[in-house]
A protein has these predicted regions:
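Metal-dependent phosphoester/phosphodiester hydrolase catalytic core
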Residues: 1-363
């Protein structure tokens, strides 16, 4: 059900419920944003990502509910497409999902989690996707798997996008048109904050230097490689340039700062993240620096670890200007979460984060 209600007052809580036949839904709660010229006293929001059903229960949501947020931002990997595996905390229904019915069933299964249900009930959500809502590490119309025909992959993308729209709180303007779905958009909270919600999957070129972890060399510097696509990048720059908000928040998926997963002598970086699209990353950071965009903050999910990063104009120069801040949040349940996956990367950070608590990030 997608309801777009008009005529509501700004900056207030509303309660609602649905009737169909003899059935009545639980009472939901949502909040309207302040008018654009108003400076609200505060905005309290949470962001999350990466909730793998089989890896654990979604226990972060009850903590969010206790903190009474104005907004929840989900940065992607709301579901995972993989087949069910035995001897996990709980098991996906069926094989790897490909059909529209498969995707619908997977969303329905995830929505049986009580914590997730309740968080949707008590606060508005601002959502975007990453890769697992469709297929791991895909880029536009390119599968990470060999031997998948373009026709088969396109049909699967149509199914994945349709199911995502059906289950997410999205307006009619995001209604899919076949394999295409416009998800990038802006959301204003008065003059305090402007959210620029991005899509780093649908329009990106294929990973220019291949997938996985590799040095920053060769095709990483491809001038034609793009993370956002030409149209979305132009839209983002136009909105950043026109913004008069105190904070400009980029809600997106993959880590923007470089994370060395190798050694100091032989550094390796994820080619699926922004370092794999170095020209695209530099162009965006340079634009924000030259136009003096007010207080850029990048929200990131994807890698199941907490990081706080300075976004420098040139990451190879320690004295390079700092353009903004990146906040990388750990997973809701997916593997890692500051555990065994940390061993190889602690040395690349000035500060390591050990986990999360109901009060925030533990340093």
């Amino acid at each position: 059900v997608h309801v777009e209600v008009e005529g509501l007052e700004a900056e207030r809580w509303y309660f609602y419920r649905f009737h169909t036949g003899s059935e009545v839904s639980p009472v939901g709660r949502t909040r309207t944003t302040p008018e654009r010229h108003v400076m609200p006293e505060r905005l309290k929001f949470a962001f999350t990502s990466c909730q793998h059903w089989e890896s654990g229960f979604f226990n972060g949501y009850p903590h969010m509910q206790q903190d009474d947020h104005d907004l929840v931002v989900h940065l992607g990997d709301y579901i995972y497409e993989y087949a069910g595996i035995d001897n996990r905390v709980r098991k996906h229904l069926g094989p790897e999902i490909t059909s529209l019915d498969d995707y619908r069933l997977r969303y329905s299964q995830y929505r049986t989690d009580i914590g997730l249900q309740e968080m949707h009930r008590v606060a508005p959500w601002l959502v975007t996707w990453d890769d697992h809502e469709f297929d791991n590490n895909y880029a536009n119309l390119v599968s990470e798997e060999d031997g998948i025909s373009p026709e088969t992959f396109l049909a699967r993308r149509i199914n994945a996008y349709q199911a995502y729209y059906e289950f997410m709180p999205l307006r009619r303007r995001s209604l899919p048109l076949g394999p295409d779905m416009k998800l990038y958009r802006a959301c204003h909270f008065g003059r305090l904050a402007k959210f620029h919600v991005l899509d780093t999957r649908q329009y990106r070129t294929d990973q220019p230097n291949g997938d996985h972890q590799k040095p920053m060399e060769g095709k990483v510097f491809d001038q034609n490689a793009t993370m956002l696509g030409t149209k979305q990048e132009y839209w983002l720059m136009r909105h950043l340039n026109a913004s008069h908000s105190t904070w400009n928040v980029l809600a997106q998926q993959v880590m923007m700062a470089p994370l060395n997963r190798g050694t100091p002598e032989k550094p390796l970086y994820s080619m699926d993240q922004w370092p794999g699209y170095e020209v695209s990353r530099r162009r965006l950071l340079k634009y924000m620096h030259e136009r003096r965009v007010p207080n850029p903050v990048v929200l990131t999910g994807d890698i199941h670890l907490n990081w706080v990063n300075d976004l420098q104009l040139d990451f190879q120069d320690p004295d390079s200007p700092i353009v903004g801040t990146e906040l990388v949040g750990t997973a809701m349940s997916s593997g890692g979460n500051g555990g065994r996956g940390r061993n190889g990367i602690d040395g690349s950070a000035q500060a390591g984060f050990t986990g999360t608590s109901g009060l925030g990030i533990e340093v």
